[in-house]
UniProtKB/Swiss-Prot annotation:
It comes from the Viruses. Residues 171-172 are annotated as: Membrane association. The BC-like-box motif mediates the interaction with elongin BC complex. Vif-defective viruses show catastrophic failure in reverse transcription due to APOBEC-induced mutations that initiate a DNA base repair pathway and compromise the structural integrity of the ssDNA. In the absence of Vif, the virion is morphologically abnormal. Induction: Expressed late during infection in a Rev-dependent manner. This is Virion infectivity factor. One of its GO terms (biological process) is viral life cycle.
Length: 193
């Protein structure tokens, strides 16, 4: 019998991003309780030795999003590309498909976090109560209508500490961007000038 290979999309990710992602997810599961119902699976609970962690994010329609982080994969294109990666799956019953990070963020946003969305315009005109702000801006990246942008400008921005976990932020490419180096100004008094 021949080997049957299964191909998966794995986003190559920096090791420190995975560490940050896992700690943010655990914080919002156990401390802030905003990720209610999420399940964090440790590497020692998984039968696959390449899996570093697995986060199960359930939805109302009995589907779930599974974000799996991998380690010890074969190295990437460059020497500093250590073998760390992330795969994102959406499951409904026995149906499984791969999802891109932006779609995953939209799914999470629609289900879990309070949002100041397009319906806010209509509700504000009707005099109804409007949610004050969007907690998870990564969930909708498109440009809104003029009325939506005006309402958004009216509401003051509040930063969340720590931020909510974003799959798109986890998978963004940092290796191929040029890094800026800080130019330190010399201390003139120390140099004798």
């Amino acid at each position: 019998m021949e080997n049957r290979w299964q191909v998966m999309i794995v986003w190559q990710v920096d090791r420190m991003r995975i560490k940050t992602w896992n700690s943010l997810v655990k914080y919002h599961i156990y401390r802030s309780k905003k990720a209610r119902g999420w399940f964090y699976r440790h590497h020692y609970d998984h039968p696959n030795p390449k899996v570093a962690s697995e986060i199960h994010i359930p939805f109302r329609d009995y589907s779930k999003l599974i974000v799996t982080t991998y380690w010890a994969l074969s190295p990437g294109e460059r020497a500093w590309h250590l073998g760390h990666g992330v795969s994102i799956q959406w499951r409904l019953g026995s149906y499984v498909t791969q999802v891109d990070p932006f779609t995953a963020d939209r799914l999470i946003h629609s289900q879990y976090f309070d949002c100041f969305a397009e319906t806010a315009i209509r509700r504000a005109i009707l005099g109804q109560l409007v949610a004050p702000r969007c907690e998870y801006k990564e969930g909708h990246r498109q440009v809104g209508s003029l009325q939506f942008l005006a309402l958004k400008a009216l509401i003051s921005e509040r930063r969340h500490r720590p931020p909510l976990p974003s799959v798109a932020k986890l998978t963004e490419d940092r290796w191929n961007k040029h890094q800026r180096t800080k130019v330190h100004q010399e201390n003139l008094t120390r140099n004798g000038h």
